[in-house]
Amino acid sequence: MPFVTIDLFEGRSQEQKNQLAREVTEVVSRIAKAPKENIHVFINDMPEGTYYPQGEMKQKS
C-alpha cells in the first residue's frame, strides 16, 4: 500500500492539487504495480515561514 507525501508551499489551486494527485497515482500504479485504490497521496500546503533549510527561512520564489 504506497503512501506518497508531497510538501508544497501553499498557493496551488484545488484543481492543480487534484491533477497532481491523479498523475502521481497513475505513475506509482504503473511503476510499483500497485492497484490505484491502494495508493494514498497526501499533499501538505506549507505556509510561508515554515521551511528552514540549513537553518535559514526559505521564501517562495
Swiss-Prot record:
Belongs to the 4-oxalocrotonate tautomerase family. GO terms for molecular function: isomerase activity. Its EC number is 5.3.2.-. The keyword Isomerase applies. This is Probable tautomerase SPy_1139/M5005_Spy0861. The active site is at residue 2. Keywords: Isomerase. PANTHER family: 2-HYDROXYMUCONATE TAUTOMERASE (PTHR35530:SF1), TAUTOMERASE-RELATED (PTHR35530).
